[in-house]
Amino acid sequence: MSSPTKLTAWQKLTEHKQEMASVSMKSLFEADPKRAEKYTTQAAGWTLDYAKNRANEKTLSLLTDLAKEAGLESAIKGMFSGAHINNTEDRSVLHIALRASQAQETLMVDGVNVLAEVRATLKQMEAFVTQLHNGEWKGYTGKRITDVISIGIGGSYLGPKVVAEALTPYKKDGIKVHFVANIDGSDITGKLKLVNPETTVFVISSKTFGTLETLSNANAARDWFLSNGGSQSDVSKHFAAVSSNVKKAVDFGMAEENIFPMWDWVGGRYSLWSAIGLPVAIAVGMDNFYELLDGAHQMDEHFRTTPFEENLPVIMGTLGVWYINFHNAQTHALIPYDHYLRAMPAHIQQLDMESNGKSTLLNGDGVETDTGPIIWGGAGTNGQHAYHQLLHQGTRLVPVDFIVPLASHNPIGEHHAQLFANCLSQSQALMVGKTLEQAQQELRDAGASPDQVEAIAPHKVIKGNRPSNTLLTDKMTPATVGALIALYEHRTFVQGTIWGINSFDQWGVELGKVLGTDIYNRLVSDSDNSALDASTQALIKAFKKAQA
């Protein structure tokens, strides 16, 4: 695909942006009493209210045209059929197969029925989880397992950790699940202080069983185990792996039956639905893990079959393109008004930025427009006392997604009503703002003098007309959490398709790994560093001096 800027719909949107320059969202609501009803749609347990956007019917029609002209319909068919849409690695992209309906028996990719492999892995996971929870799996001293430490990084860490945290109300008694990712020794040291080697199982997640951070932490965990009473022959009772490199995992000390597969057609940031999600299944049980998969599948089917005009991922994805490419928005904020979802922005940050942080088109040419935005955010209402000031009065346009359940798992007094009120008030305030006249009258009503009114009122002006979406669900459940994450996966795919980039490789990450290994070797040796830049040389010298 060539640059999307050459598409007819893109050029029409460029003209339309000028038409919309002086249009306020308030005026759009005033002109259409049914706007809220028209700009609300539902799928997989979620309701999307996108009425508070700088968009009218013409905007949305042009955005739909853009998606179609960019080939989104064929791209969706390609992904769901197993086509090699990851062109730089010549791979299928089949995270959707990990949560396919049980009614679907086959999905052939390169001569292999991948659904058979997925179902076999789920049964393997189920047996593992059952043994842990019923006490059949025992440690080397015969005691029941009480703790599981998951060791991974990136998609092998963020997704499972975020989902396990989001499903806190569904956690099973008896086993606590902990997560380790950072190669900073403080991370694993802190977790090991919480557990007993006799009753702890480690799950090591690494496709190659060679990821630097993960393998370093796995070795540290094994060393700790061996120095606290365990023997090498006991390692198989306390270590399992999710990896495609069975030999390396066996050499580490694991039993082959406790090594779970990974596949090339699943990228790390899309892998929580696979055996990478084993820590989630241990935390909440396989019944809830299946519900998680089912919720994601419901969103998959919505995305695959629903007309673009009513399609949640398409609507959210194209609106994002509208702001990034036609309003110069450089970031996008996710603000969940649910304590258990507080870490979700970090997962979506990886999902989106690793997928769409690209500057090369599928055909090898350089892009001619902005691609992936910076994704950030945090829990409401905490953010209101931190960064919301910039959202309301800052100079940069930041589209916002508010995510909130209608009911809480912990109904205490008026807490949830207050939480919900804050969420709605923030979206409303972003839209309506405060005029100079309103600020002046507010000050007069408070008894301010004319001089004070003149001096202070300009500082209280809030321009408004800042866009936001609101996502509602009845309650955060395994199914709705699954659907929510799948929604953002598909939203990311929509945008990548429109921009004409590959959302499923990550060559920038790979470069960092290579250079990291090179620098490490220089830190621990007396190699000649004269070919390096002066800054890197000085930093290496500082490290060596500190270690002397």
Curated annotation (Swiss-Prot):
Belongs to the GPI family. It comes from the Bacteria. Its EC number is 5.3.1.9. Catalyzes the reversible isomerization of glucose-6-phosphate to fructose-6-phosphate. It catalyses: alpha-D-glucose 6-phosphate = beta-D-fructose 6-phosphate. CDD domains: SIS_PGI_1 (cd05015), SIS_PGI_2 (cd05016). HAMAP family: G6P_isomerase. PANTHER family: GLUCOSE-6-PHOSPHATE ISOMERASE. GO terms for biological process: gluconeogenesis; glucose 6-phosphate metabolic process; glycolytic process. This is Glucose-6-phosphate isomerase. It is found in: Cytoplasm. InterPro entries: G6P_Isomerase, G6P_Isomerase_C, Phosphoglucose_isomerase_CS, SIS_dom_sf, SIS_PGI_1, SIS_PGI_2. It holds the Pfam family PGI. Its main location: cytoplasm. Pathway: Carbohydrate biosynthesis; gluconeogenesis; Carbohydrate degradation; glycolysis; D-glyceraldehyde 3-phosphate and glycerone phosphate from D-glucose: step 2/4. NCBIfam families: PRK00179.1 (NF001211). One of its GO terms (molecular function) is carbohydrate derivative binding. One of its GO terms (cellular component) is cytosol. Keywords: Cytoplasm, Gluconeogenesis, Glycolysis, Isomerase. The active site is at 354 (proton donor), 385, 513.
